[in-house]
Amino acid sequence: MKIACIGGGPGGLYFAISIKLQKPSTDVIVIERNKPADTFGWGVVLSDETLDNLEKNDSISAESIRSNFAYWDDIALHHKGKKLKSTGHGFCGIGRKTLLVILQERARELGVQLKFESEVGSASDYMNDYDIVVAADGLNSKTRSEYAEIFKPDTDLRKCQFVWLGTKQKFDDAFTFIFEKTKHGWVWAHAYQFDSDTATFIVECSQDTFDAFGFNNLTQTESINVCQDIFKNYLDDNKLMTNANHIRGSAWIKFPRVICEKWSHKNI
């Protein structure tokens, strides 16, 4: 059997690993348009339950992930000058780039062919040459858009705006939520450690607050400076950082919820 996987993110790579573990004779290729180390996010979060599932599926890659994550058991909430803490919530954070490298190495060990810096084109281009074409091309999937009449996606764009940043400030004792009331309304942050030096720092606010600050008209640098000022009491003079310089403008986006009525078409 020959399988082409369009998209070399964590989902595409882990699918390739899983199919090779189940059917080692399968010919699997993963095609990715970016370079191996390219990534435009910071850390990702995995729960204890997810880690257990990864362990059951592939103990080797699971162990590599475990040896590279930051773990916490608490959730801390900062609101109106008070700090509330809740314990018993097992989660870990791992750098997205580190996760990609681990999965790439494991996929190669199992015989998966990885093809980087290659524009995929249409999923239909692979239908005749491969038994199965897996569309792992992300949230803004071109495949889903191309076959929208068949997959019938239902996309609900959520109401709040957010920007995904990083910082050298330590948040290694808890998954941290910070709520700050500003002259334009509430702004909040989700912060968590994902390696020994760096934490994810997601800033979020309502559309009204976003508009009042004029974030849509600011450059990324200007936008980050505003966020640093809002959360300065929690950053200890550490900067907020972006790795989304490939995006024009402020890099704020909304969370979409995507559900498809149908998830396959022919051999895609």
Put a short name on every predicted segment.
Residues E105, D129-F255, I259, S264:
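Conserved FAD-binding catalytic core of PHBH/FMO-like flavoproteins
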Residues M1-G11:
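Beta1/beta-strand and adjacent pyrophosphate-binding region of the FAD-binding site
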Residues D48-W164:
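Conserved N-terminal helical subregion
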Residues G11, F15, P36, N140:
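Conserved Rossmann-like nucleotide-cofactor binding loop
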